[in-house]
Amino acid sequence: MRALWVLGLCCVLLTFGSVRAEDEVDVDGTVEEDLGKSREGSRTDDEVVQREEEAIQLDGLNASQIRELREKSEKFAFQAEVNRMMKLIINSLYKNKEIFLRELISNASDALDKIRLISLTDENALAGNEELTVKIKCDKEKNLLHVTDTGVGMTREELVKNLGTIAKSGTSEFLNKMAEAQEDGQSTSELIGQFGVGFYSAFLVADKVIVTSKHNNDTQHIWESDSNEFSVIADPRGNTLGRGTTITLVLKEEASDYLELDTIKNLVKKYSQFINFPIYVWSSKTETVEEPMEEEEAAKEEKEESDDEAAVEEEEEEKKPKTKKVEKTVWDWELMNDIKPIWQRPSKEVEDDEYKAFYKSFSKESDDPMAYIHFTAEGEVTFKSILFVPTSAPRGLFDEYGSKKSDYIKLYVRRVFITDDFHDMMPKYLNFVKGVVDSDDLPLNVSRETLQQHKLLKVIRKKLVRKTLDMIKKIADEKYNDTFWKEFGTNIKLGVIEDHSNRTRLAKLLRFQSSHHPSDITSLDQYVERMKEKQDKIYFMAGSSRKEAESSPFVERLLKKGYEVIYLTEPVDEYCIQALPEFDGKRFQNVAKEGVKFDESEKSKENREAVEKEFEPLLNWMKDKALKDKIEKAVVSQRLTESPCALVASQYGWSGNMERIMKAQAYQTGKDISTNYYASQKKTFEINPRHPLIRDMLRRVKEDEDDKTVSDLAVVLFETATLRSGYLLPDTKAYGDRIERMLRLSLNIDPDAKVEEEPEEEPEETTEDTTEDTEQDDDEEMDAGADEEEQETSETSTAEKDEL
């Protein structure tokens, strides 16, 4: 009887436990429905329920409330440029849709940077929500993806302006750059983030985008769009965010893969692991937990115990409840970027792949960097920095050079992002360098303008430049010549012109073409190593192309004697060399100017003086008579071997190449006094005494210095030398006339012979092809003849009447 009573009691207990389990299922099911996640996972405890309530809700409104909300919302049309831009993004990036998440997280990070910066001077800025995070949640059941940040948020006006008009988005420039990239066949995905239009990439995967935002200075609003138009309305739920923005994407059918946790996690790690704020993903994991055993299981286990001594000891101790280990699936926010800021870690602990991944993350580039340097500067100011040289030059690198801010150096103070809008963080010529600078010595609670004038920034700038030049210097020669110089060579030349304190360092980075090799470029160090034994100058020749420079009459004797000549073929090259007075103790010599001299023996000197005396009549005649108003003086040349003559500038005058450049600039800006002055400077006319034309001219001048033919020949030689020396002729028509006159004389044609007049053309008779047309013409002629006869008869009668 007693056994039956015990058995009945056990049944009651089992039934009660079953009811409790069913109740727990119902409670957990409600929580799951609220979160929009799968019902297949194990149930969660009360602590997790509280965390789930912090998860992002879709609307908190039923279907009828949502419909009413949309009916009352204010409708807006996108600007035409924004509409065009969205279509361009969707059409050009459809194969790289995943970048939408990178852009949304990047925008969230920017919003967090802004509120953190505001909080430095406004202690109430974080009152609505002190947490600075990005949270991502997938809702498979409702086909929704949420991205929430606790950043600065947007007011109603900002929602309209930032997400619907061109004023804030940089759309116009983006469209131009996008078109250029497509024409060049280059990747366009990195352009999205660079021009602040990354938000619109959400439409790559979403049919509809809903933005809920709360700014400290406004109530919470909802922005909604299907890419055709957008609407904005006050959120009837009130302030559910505290502060920040939630972007909800209603995903397209083919984009359902972005609701998979593994996909989202991989994308966050791929693109955003170096974001400076924690990124959480609402995800599940399996945990092993201890649960109390039921009484029947516990009793069974006790019976299986065979150790009597253990049993005795257990009886003596206070009996503990029996437990068992079970696996349970729980949901929680999982941190995806728990990596310490890479620049705060010792460089020895950072792998090469980590640097590359960080570069791509913060620069929004798709290629690996060409070079990088990670260092800690100590002394007057302490800071940590990582600097990168990109593989290719940014688009528009020299557009409005010096007037546009550089966005490539990000300044942090005590890990707090301050700005990327400093004009003087790096010199203009290093505007391609990207990186971060983090200092503990700069003040936090001051304005950007005040910080920009801080004396420590000048110290930081100086060290950044030195480290950048060290980084560039370490690039391997082959990679430097083939890649770096092609992309950034002009920047180095501008640095020589602008940066006096680092001119010597920059000079070692210069590369030019030279006569040493038909295609390879050379450094100045290599040139100096190859100089002839008694050569004391570095020779260079400037021209619009290598072909023009190496065919110039100025390099004839130099090349024949085995001297190497550097060819300057870019407009900035001659400015660069002028700013560099010497290199390694060797001065530069422009071979198109006065001052080119060669070592000569005593006998050579005597021969030269004898030749000068022999040609003195011709030289004086040219200077005082034939070319009186055109040249400063005429001399026997030491640099010509094949050409009859050349026009040489003074040491302070302009070469032909420089004059051409300056005149082109003058036409754009309007001529100034200095341009006119240098352009009007007379030059030295050098003649080649061994050339047959010059020798014959000497003979003719000795015979008759008033011979007009010889005078014309002298002027033609001067004008030809002007062109061959790289200068422009002021009167090309007169030059053409003189050439024609010389040709007439060479062909024994009378200089005054006129051009034959063209004969007058007689009107052509038209012949009709068809018989019908001919007959019609005959009829018309007969009618016309009859009319003429009648007219003559009438005129005759009138005349007779007049006589009577």
UniProtKB/Swiss-Prot annotation:
Belongs to the heat shock protein 90 family. This is Endoplasmin. CDD domains: HATPase_Hsp90-like. GO terms for molecular function: ATP binding; ATP hydrolysis activity; ATP-dependent protein folding chaperone; unfolded protein binding. It catalyses: ATP + H2O = ADP + phosphate + H(+). Residues 288-323, 750-804 are annotated as: Disordered. The modification N6-(2-hydroxyisobutyryl)lysine is found at residue 168. Pfam families: HATPase_c_3 (PF13589), HSP90 (PF00183). Its main location: endoplasmic reticulum. GO terms for biological process: ERAD pathway; protein folding. Glycans are attached at residues 62, 107, 217, 445, 481, 502. The SRT pseudosubstrate motif associates with STT3A during translation in normal conditions, preventing glycosylation of facultative sites until HSP90B1 folding is completed. It is found in: Endoplasmic reticulum lumen; Sarcoplasmic reticulum lumen; Melanosome. SMART domains: HATPase_c. ATP binds at residues 107, 149, 162, 199. HAMAP family: HSP90. One of its GO terms (cellular component) is endoplasmic reticulum.
